[in-house]
């Protein structure tokens, strides 16, 4: 019996090593066949996790989502194997691209919790942040953004994304003071899209609070700084006209609207916002 077992385990290793050699040569299609054959011949084989991992990677290379989901799914049945972090990443990414955000979120949360490197931990948190934002789950967004912002090495782009989504979540939760703190940090750089929108939102917060002087100051400062993101500058011009109406400076309000009407060319909702306000100012 011992001999039979020994022969079988030798056969197991030889079959696996042969498949791995083909893969290492960069021959994905025959390697895929060999790994698949290996798993069929040795279902619980000593190298079955490795084979599932390689089939996952080949599936990703060949843009075969079903293969990635199948083999990553198999790897995830063994929670603490050496491939589980990569499996969570690949599995989560496909679910995210398929707009199955709740399922992707679960993968990213596991990755965030068990990641062995800061980079993987960040990838998990970014996944949770983006899924949470798309699902309008403010608590998930706030937790993930806060975890990201506590990271020692975070790129400026990711810092901005985390601040932006956290600010939006705080606004939804009526946590205006916390939202304002995040928005004001973002608004320091209006060259970025998040910064330009944040600058507008800071002014909007002042306007909604009835603090018209601060709203006016914020917008005039935005006009001075300028931004490549013309839409948010235009929205700020419109907000400035609302501020002037509230301050009973209707003439100024009208002038800003007319100037915007002449200078703003894009085909979006700005024109209708201008017309709606000009109607009321007649």
Predicted regions and their residues:
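Acidic, polar-rich low-complexity tracts and alpha-helical solenoid repeat scaffolds
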Residues: 2-282
């Amino acid at each position: 019996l011992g001999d039979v077992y020994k022969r079988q385990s030798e056969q197991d290793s030889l079959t696996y090593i042969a498949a791995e050699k083909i893969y290492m040569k960069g021959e994905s299609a025959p390697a895929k066949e060999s790994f698949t054959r290996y798993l069929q011949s040795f279902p619980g084989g000593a190298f079955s996790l490795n084979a599932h991992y390689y089939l996952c990677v080949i599936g990703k290379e060949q843009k075969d989502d079903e293969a990635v989901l199948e083999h990553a799914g198999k790897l995830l049945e063994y929670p603490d194997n050496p491939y589980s972090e990569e499996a969570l990443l690949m599995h989560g990414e496909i679910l995210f691209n398929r707009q199955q955000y709740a399922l992707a979120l679960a993968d990213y949360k596991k990755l965030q919790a068990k990641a062995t490197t800061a980079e993987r931990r960040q990838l998990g948190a970014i996944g949770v942040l983006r899924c949470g934002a798309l699902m309008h789950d403010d608590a998930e967004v706030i937790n993930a953004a806060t975890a990201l912002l506590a990271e020692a090495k975070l790129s400026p782009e990711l810092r901005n994304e985390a601040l932006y989504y956290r600010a939006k979540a705080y606004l939804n939760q009526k946590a205006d003071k916390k939202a304002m703190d995040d928005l004001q940090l973002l608004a320091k750089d209006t060259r970025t899209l998040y910064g330009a929108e944040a600058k507008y939102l800071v002014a909007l917060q002042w306007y909604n609070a009835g603090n018209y002087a601060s709203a006016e100051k914020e917008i005039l400062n935005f006009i001075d700084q300028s931004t490549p993101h013309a839409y948010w500058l235009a929205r700020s011009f419109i907000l400035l006209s609302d501020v002037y109406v509230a301050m009973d400076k209707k003439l100024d309000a009208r002038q800003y609207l007319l100037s915007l009407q002449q200078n703003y060319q894009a085909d979006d909702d700005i024109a209708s916002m201008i017309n709606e306000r000009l109607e009321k100012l007649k």
